[in-house]
């Protein structure tokens, strides 16, 4: 066994040398301090250290909160250890012995009666440690319990334990008072009545930490309850220990006292402590696969001075996984046991010589109710090249993501609100934020407008009022802003710029004319090309006669040479010549008619009448004329005003509002009216028309409203999905059957064991084993560190529905229709023909947090014969017990001569949750909004518009106009208030007071308009009396007076909206903003443009006449500058 011990020692020492000695302990805090004596707890597993150094371990804290003094007292432990006998060469039950000694340990988790309660009242912390040891080394586990007030007092502090430094980090969750489980906030409660009152009842698996508190008294005889609960036959002689366990649930709770009969949380913990007494293991990362060597059963004396053995143990060697601190049960006085390298007997089916754990960690199932999910608010301000944003939520933010922002991990809490700051690097696109199940959009266009206004106002800071008034007009994005700038520049500096620009244009035209035309109107470029061609022809010799070598001037002359010279004749006078070059050249010198061809060419040329050219005309243009400048100035002002009015409101992308003029479109009913279109699931649709009789002057109002899609699924709740760590442990002993010993993993919820018993090969036994055919190698697989990660629901049926309302004259009808269903009235038929969806019957919906946050769609979720690593492998259904996965792999025992056998497993070791998270992008996801759910049904609306409905609307032409034409409903309008800004940025919200008389209900639409254009509408069902309607719109200008309108009628008074500025921009909910509105109103025409221009001009100067004065000053300055640069030409008197 000596060589094996040295190998284990090396494997334990090496990680200590390589790891850093500073470790993090995270304590999760809710962001409000609730009533009651709540405490929070955190713990951290530390690397192994030599057993001899544990006697000097004392926790030392630098935290501002004092540590409870009673933990500084020394606790006497009976240390039980084992050693091999010198006279035994082979392993057997008698080859080793136990030794009991008394040791003093300081700072272990020996809690006194009322210590936790006193620490809460005195605002002190409890810092202690547990030990998991073998015969050589110990792994400390440091615990810290603090009152919940510490969450408000501290952010971090440092604790020293031996050679290690632990950084305590207080991390606030988004939960108000509850515990964060599966990404949800829940409140464990012992009262089922209060659970039903507060919300949805559910069962959750929660982590719990328990400490034994020794106290004498008849009410603290813990084994009396053990006998009642587990039908034990133990008597008080064998089990005299008195005390109770004090537990903290979920890392944040009031103390729970175990056992307490009327608290089922307490009884759940009590059951876990005595059925699975070892609790969760203390394995570090990388210790999932380990080996034990069982030495054998042993007895020890506790205390060391006892006359007989009082405690049964099992000696082992290998990696320590479970606590080595326990309490002897056979004494009324608390006898503390420290057993490095030995498992104390914690199973109480046999009553004698047992112990109970000093500390216990595990999972219990408790009922709960959910904390509500609150809506959030987000706004952004311009910061450098990007934007700085803040999100708030009253009840906390459980998730916040943005595809174009860097979401900060630093959270701040203000009273009951949680604040999250994040930075967006780009503002050229709108910022989309997903938070608390909502999708909101920050329109960054307004941020850019604000930056523009700020810059222009800063440049002209001498007149800030004037600069701001002009800046808010210039900074409107798109063509409208450029048109505004052109209009102002033309008005102020047109008298200088018009002649200057004209001069530049004339210079360019004259340059072009000079290039392409001569004074005789001949194309100069063509002339140059012709001369180049002639010179090229001369260069290559084509104008030279082949016989006489004379260079001709015209092609006709060359042709005459080609006829006469071969016949020995002069081509000019036809005289006979010798057929040689010299004779011809001598004759040409004396010939009198060599100019014959040149004279013929001159006769064919006729004189042309020359007219003044383009260049001369451009030179004579009088661009300095005051008449020309005034005419162009007036023309440009009118043209730019029209262009400005036409561009005064941008047309946003569908499916949102399109600006139009006042009124409602009309349709003559010659034939049936049919509409066929597709509609995204997040969009509303409003269709409004005035149907007219083509034969007579009769009409009737039609108003159709289709609300956004509601997705409803009937589900079967599959339960909670867990993540866990799979451990592979080898337990070897040289003698005895495999069933002789109880291994610690037997009490794990999910475990599987394969035994190799009584091996007959020498190669599978170490050298100190007694021989062939003895001993056992037990290969154990078990799951620990179980953590609930999500809730799964299987879709049984799915339904897509929309609410349809129709106002036909005075007839008002509504109905909720499904896919392949229709709304049918006497004149109108609205049908959903089909739906394009990514959901189907049999799919499984998995939520990793609150249902409001959306989830994943699984097409192949395993509900039966689940193997470890499948989706749904570790489940806890509500109507069944804990479901463990199958482990389909096979074991193999690896043997080497004279060494301990090692188990190998060829199956999957990665949990299904970890596999899903590694490939999460391959799964379809969905977002939810307006969530309603029960155990059997879930309903939500899709904020992303990922689904589509095929809608068909049919209105028959057979309408009884005589009986339906008159609508008795009377509507009165009044504008109450306005919020927001004009322009195409964030927009404005107009509050309208609408009164309805003469009929009980009326479905119609209220618009937000100025004198020329309407910028938004809201479809609303009015009831008799006074109604408050809020209408949102985008657009308008500084002169717009926004009014509430119904058809052609508007409220008598209007209100001005604020100018877009550098203020914060709030996010807009996509569900509220996604709507398609079609009322057939005409587009803005020329008359509308002039009305809009007049309203703007009157508005820009209304209340700020200094702007007009400043503009006129600039105009006068330009006139003076014109007179200096372009003086009037003086004409001489005749």
Swiss-Prot record:
It holds the Pfam family ITAM_Cys-rich. Glycans are attached at residues 134, 235, 347, 399, 927. Disulfide bonds join 29-151, 63-157, 109-128, 133-138, 175-185, 210-247, 234-351, 380-389, 405-424, 452-475, 734-769, 738-776, 750-884, 764-895, 779-903, 805-814, 822-831, 969-999, 992-1044, 1009-1014, 1045-1050, 1084-1088. Residues 611-634 form the ITAM domain. Keywords: Disulfide bond, Fusion of virus membrane with host endosomal membrane, Fusion of virus membrane with host membrane, Glycoprotein, Host endoplasmic reticulum, Host Golgi apparatus, Host membrane, Host mitochondrion, Host-virus interaction, Inhibition of host innate immune response by virus, Inhibition of host RLR pathway by virus, Inhibition of host TRAFs by virus, Membrane, Metal-binding, Phosphoprotein, Repeat, Signal, Transmembrane, Transmembrane helix, Viral attachment to host cell, Viral envelope protein, Viral immunoevasion, Viral penetration into host cytoplasm, Virion, Virus endocytosis by host, Virus entry into host cell, Zinc, Zinc-finger. PROSITE patterns: ITAM_2 (PS51056). It comes from the Viruses. The keyword 4Fe-4S does not apply. Residues 509-627, 1126-1134 are cytoplasmic. Residues 756-776 are annotated as: Fusion loop. The chain crosses the membrane at residues 488-508, 628-648, 1105-1125. Residues 19-487, 649-1104 are lumenal. The record marks 648-649 as: Cleavage. GO terms for cellular component: host cell endoplasmic reticulum membrane; host cell Golgi membrane; host cell mitochondrion; host cell surface; membrane; viral envelope; virion membrane. A motif (YxxL) lies at residues 615-618. Residues 1-18 form the signal peptide. Belongs to the hantavirus envelope glycoprotein family. This is Envelopment polyprotein.
């Amino acid at each position: 066994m000596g060589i094996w011990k040295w190998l284990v020692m090396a494997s334990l020492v090496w990680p200590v040398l390589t790891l850093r000695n500073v470790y993090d302990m995270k304590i999760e805090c809710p962001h409000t301090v609730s009533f009651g004596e709540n405490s929070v707890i955190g713990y951290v597993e530390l690397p192994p250290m030599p057993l001899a150094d544990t006697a000097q371990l004392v926790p030392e804290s630098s935290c501002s909160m004092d540590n409870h003094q009673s933990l500084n007292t020394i606790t006497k432990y009976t240390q039980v250890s084992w050693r091999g006998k010198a006279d035994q060469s082979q392993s057997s039950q008698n080859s080793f012995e136990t030794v009991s000694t008394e040791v003093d340990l300081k700072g272990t988790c020996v809690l006194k009666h009322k210590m936790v309660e006193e620490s809460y009242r005195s605002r002190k912390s409890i810092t202690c440690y547990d030990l998991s040891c073998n015969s050589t080394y110990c792994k400390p586990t440091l615990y810290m319990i603090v009152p919940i007030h510490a969450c408000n007092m501290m952010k971090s502090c440092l604790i020293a334990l031996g050679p290690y430094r632990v950084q305590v980090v207080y991390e606030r969750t988004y939960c108000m008072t509850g515990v964060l489980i599966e990404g949800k906030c829940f409140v464990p409660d012992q009262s089922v009545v209060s659970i039903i009152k507060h919300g949805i009842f559910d069962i959750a698996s929660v982590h719990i930490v328990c400490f034994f508190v020794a106290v004498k008294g008849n009410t603290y005889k813990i084994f009396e309850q053990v006998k009642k609960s587990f039908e034990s036959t133990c008597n008080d002689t064998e089990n005299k220990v008195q005390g109770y366990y004090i537990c903290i649930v979920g890392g944040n709770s009031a103390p729970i006292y175990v056992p307490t009969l009327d608290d089922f949380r307490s009884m759940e913990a009590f059951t876990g402590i005595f059925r699975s007494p070892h609790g969760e293991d203390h394995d570090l990362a990388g210790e999932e696969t380990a080996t034990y060597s069982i030495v054998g059963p042993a007895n020890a004396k506790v205390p060391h001075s006892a006359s007989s053995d009082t405690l049964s143990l099992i000696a082992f060697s290998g990696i320590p996984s479970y606590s080595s601190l326990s309490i002897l049960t056979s004494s009324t006085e608390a006898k503390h046991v420290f057993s490095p390298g030995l498992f104390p007997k914690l199973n109480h089916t046999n009553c004698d010589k047992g112990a109970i754990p000093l500390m216990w960690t595990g999972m219990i199932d408790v009922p709960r109710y959910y904390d509500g999910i609150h809506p959030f608010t987000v706004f952004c301000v311009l910061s450098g090249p990007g934007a700085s944003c803040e999100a708030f939520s009253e009840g906390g933010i459980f998730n916040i993501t943005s595809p174009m922002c860097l979401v900060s991990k630093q959270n701040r809490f203000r009273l009951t609100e949680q604040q999250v700051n994040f930075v967006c690097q780009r503002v050229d696109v709108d910022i989309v934020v997903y938070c608390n199940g909502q999708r909101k959009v920050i329109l960054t266009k307004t941020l850019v407008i604000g930056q523009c206004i700020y810059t222009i106002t800063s440049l002209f800071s001498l007149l800030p009022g004037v600069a701001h008034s002009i800046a808010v007009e210039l900074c409107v994005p798109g063509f409208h802003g450029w048109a505004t700038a052109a209009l102002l520049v033309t008005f102020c500096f047109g008298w200088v710029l018009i002649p200057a620009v004209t001069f530049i244009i004339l210079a360019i035209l004259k340059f072009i004319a000079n290039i392409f035309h001569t004074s005789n109107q001949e194309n100069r470029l063509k002339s140059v090309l012709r001369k180049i061609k002639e010179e090229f022809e001369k260069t290559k010799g084509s104008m030279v006669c082949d016989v006489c070598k004379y260079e001709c001037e015209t092609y006709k002359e060359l042709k005459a040479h080609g006829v006469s010279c071969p016949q020995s004749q002069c081509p000019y006078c036809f005289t006979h010549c010798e057929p040689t070059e010299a004779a011809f050249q001598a004759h040409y010198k004396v010939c009198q008619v060599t100019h014959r061809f040149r004279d013929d060419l001159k006769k064919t040329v006729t004189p042309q009448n020359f007219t003044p050219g383009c260049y001369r005309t451009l030179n004579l243009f009088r661009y300095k004329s005051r008449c020309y400048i005034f005419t162009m100035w007036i023309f440009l002002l009118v043209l730019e005003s029209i262009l400005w009015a036409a561009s005064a409101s941008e047309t946003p992308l569908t499916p949102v509002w399109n600006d139009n003029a006042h009124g409602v479109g009309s349709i003559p009913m010659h034939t049936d009216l049919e509409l066929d279109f597709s509609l995204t699931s997040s969009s509303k649709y409003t269709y409004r028309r005035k149907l007219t009789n083509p034969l007579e002057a009769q009409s009737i109002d039609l108003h159709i409203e289709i609300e956004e899609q509601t997705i409803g699924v009937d589900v079967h709740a599959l339960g909670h999905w867990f993540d866990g760590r799979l451990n592979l442990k080898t337990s070897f002993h040289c003698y005895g059957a495999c069933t002789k010993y109880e291994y610690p993993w037997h009490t794990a919820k999910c475990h599987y064991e394969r035994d190799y018993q009584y091996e007959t090969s020498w190669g599978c036994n170490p050298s100190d084993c007694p021989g062939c055919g003895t001993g056992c190698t037990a290969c154990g697989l078990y799951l620990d560190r179980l953590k609930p990660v999500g809730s799964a629901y299987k879709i049984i049926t799915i339904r897509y529905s929309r609410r349809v309302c129709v106002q036909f004259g005075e007839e008002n009808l509504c109905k909720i229709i499904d896919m392949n269903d229709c709304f049918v009235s006497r004149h109108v038929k609205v049908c959903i023909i089909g739906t394009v969806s990514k959901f189907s019957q049999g799919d499984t919906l998995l939520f990793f947090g609150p249902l409001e946050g959306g989830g994943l769609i699984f097409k192949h979720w395993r509900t039966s014969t689940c193997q470890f690593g499948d989706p749904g492998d570790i489940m806890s259904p509500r109507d069944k017990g804990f479901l463990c996965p199958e482990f389909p792999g096979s074991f193999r025992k690896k043997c080497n001569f004279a060494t301990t056998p090692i188990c190998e497993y060829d199956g999957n070791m990665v949990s299904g949750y970890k596999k899903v998270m590694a490939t999460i992008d391959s799964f379809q996801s969905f977002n939810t909004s307006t969530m309603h759910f029960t155990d059997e049904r879930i309903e939500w609306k899709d904020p992303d518009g990922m689904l589509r409905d095929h809608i068909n609307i049919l209105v028959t032409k057979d309408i009884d106009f005589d009986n339906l034409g008159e609508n008795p409903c009377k509507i009165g309008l009044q504008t109450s208030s306005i919020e927001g800004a004009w322009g195409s940025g964030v927009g404005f919200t107009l509050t309208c007071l609408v009164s309805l008389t003469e009929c009980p209900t009326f479905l119609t639409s209220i618009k937000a308009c100025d004198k020329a254009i309407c910028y938004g509408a809201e479809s609303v069902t009015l009831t008799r009396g006074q109604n408050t309607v809020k209408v949102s719109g985008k657009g308008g200008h500084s002169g717009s007076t926004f009014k509430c309108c119904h058809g052609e009628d508007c409220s008598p008074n209007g209100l001005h909206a604020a100018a877009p500025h550098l203020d914060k921009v709030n996010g807009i909910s996509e569900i509220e903003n996604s709507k398609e509105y079609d009322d057939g109103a005409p587009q803005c025409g020329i008359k509308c443009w002039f009305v809009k221009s007049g309203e703007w001009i009157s508005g820009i100067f209304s209340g700020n006449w200094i702007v007009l004065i400043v503009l006129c000053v600039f105009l006068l300055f330009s006139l003076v500058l014109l007179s200096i640069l372009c003086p009037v030409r003086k004409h001489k008197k005749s």
